[in-house]
Amino acid sequence: QGQALPSRRHHREGSLRAFSFSTTYPSNLCWAGICGVDENAAQTTESATATTTNTTTEAAKAEIKPAAGMQFEGVQPNEKDEVVVPAGYATSVLIAWGDPVYEDAPEFDPNNQTAEAAARQFGFNNDFAGLMEHPTDKDRMVYVCSHEYTTEPQMLPNYDPENPTDEQINIGIMGHGHTILEVSKDAKTGELKREFGPLNRRITGETEFKIVGPAAGHDLLKTSVDPTGTKVFGTFNNCAGGVTPWGTFLSGEENIDQYWANAAAVTGERPAADVKRFGVSEEASQRKWERLHDRFDLAKEPNEFNRFGYLVEINPYDPESVPVKHTALGRFKHEAGNVHVTEDGTVVCYSGDDARFEYIYKFVSSKKVKEGDVAHNMTILDEGTLYVANLEGNSPAGEITGDGDLPKDGDFDGTGKWIPLLTAHADGTAESHVDGFTGEEVAIYTRLAADEVGATKMDRPEDFEVNPVNGKLYMALTNNKYRGATGENEKKSQEDVTEYAPIRENKNGLVMELEDDYAGTEFTWNLLLVCGDPNAASTYFGGFPKEQVSPISCPDNLAFDSHGNLWISTDGNALGSNDGLYAVGLEGENRGQVICFLTVPYAAETCGPIVTDEVVMVNVQHPGETDEGTFEKPASHWPDGGDSVPRPAVAQVFRTDGQKIGMEKA
């Protein structure tokens, strides 16, 4: 997920049919990759709202012109090992895995990697991205991103998964974290160029973090290395996040289970239930880091795992600052962490728990924003109330068939309420709103606490953020093949279809639109998209004519352009087509119109979209990541070509004619 922050002051306020690749779609259409990885107060008028719900048969017969910001020729489906963009646009790489972040860092040599070098080079598998103002140089900006995870068999030569060397283990640890990078901009095209500047920084799996909020110092966070329970080294599996109005960024620790070993050694009912819920291996971990570092062995350090799974906050303008982990926001597989500031300065932070049948959360601060006071503002997320959502549909259960048929009222929609879990107070204490849990336990065992209050089970809630133009919330629900499953997966189904999850064995995902009262406890919701093949009866595109939309599946990260259009990046390629970035209209006759803007290289995921009037950026994650691909036999050669190993990288797209993104020529 990506965000641009051009000016801080503005932020106060069913199975798919397979198509052959010879199929050509209308110029505004494109095939979306299907997700192969299934685990891991608006200001619009009533009349505008009325026009966005359904489209008449007569309107469906005529092709509808794309909205401003979406006026480009859609990219056709492909399996090319490159970034494919519309005619009139060009693409380049800003930075790739291994490129130096510091001027004294070595150039990347894939055959001679070291942990020492990796700590000063661009990390692996960049995911979340943000583009922020430069504090002193009007000709530069600051690019920030997370490095979610490493894929050692494809990044390291002579790698044996069962017996990694000590150096290989440490290279992997250093490949995680974040990069902060100064960039300059071409005045004509908007293309960005990386620079060596004093703000450049790499945060790794060994960087010191401070634990803050109600769980800080609790016995469950104390280890032999840190008996205070307030200091932890590193951050792992940082997925989506968000830029804050006070000039920091948030990043969610997501699939942390893969780094730890020996869950079978964990004792106590609640701790054991927690590691099982996260999916920690009962024996050796995937990467075998526990062989070199005791902290990844639950048999030796049972509390180290409790120090991960939080939203972290980083100040990119102070390279010496210590990043923090916010325990008041709860501990789970955080996907996203997006902030909205109400008119009175209250901060609301939204986040999803990216796993099947998990929950969505928001945090409402008790402190107010103080403009220009970063030190104060970085404590805002330590005091306030954490909520989890409960959703209800407006239609009788019998009208939800599981096949995507709309209920009689014509919409998948309903209401919701936010249920309080804990309140963190100014004196450092935490008040629990869950019977049987202390406030500190709610902060650590958030999933288990949410179970107790009747939270709603969702289909892998990922990116979740407020549209700055219309004030509504949008959430990507990537998929859930176990929803209402039958046959071999029946035992894995925790819940049947419902109005908020109306597709049985949901392989293609949903996009939900919410109108929240922000600091309050009630909201309404509707499904904007039921993703998949528009020829399938199960799909729905906000009432837009199906024959004029791109098929889209497995929505993951979200962004918004200056016109208020929604942009969605996808994750997966089960039908063989490359992933992409899609623009979606939200208002009037364009509501639900989906057009493909780009596709990424073979077997890559599209992450961290940033959409400005001058440039579109995506993080190209894990190009060539297949079961067969290795360092010696790569499945992709992007971005360097030839016989090179693939490198995750930042791709940028810009106009060649100097016009604005998504606008017809003046």
Description of each model-found segment:
Residues 1-5, 9, 13-14:
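N-terminal secretory signal peptides
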Residues 13-29, 35-39, 49, 55-666:
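Conserved small-residue
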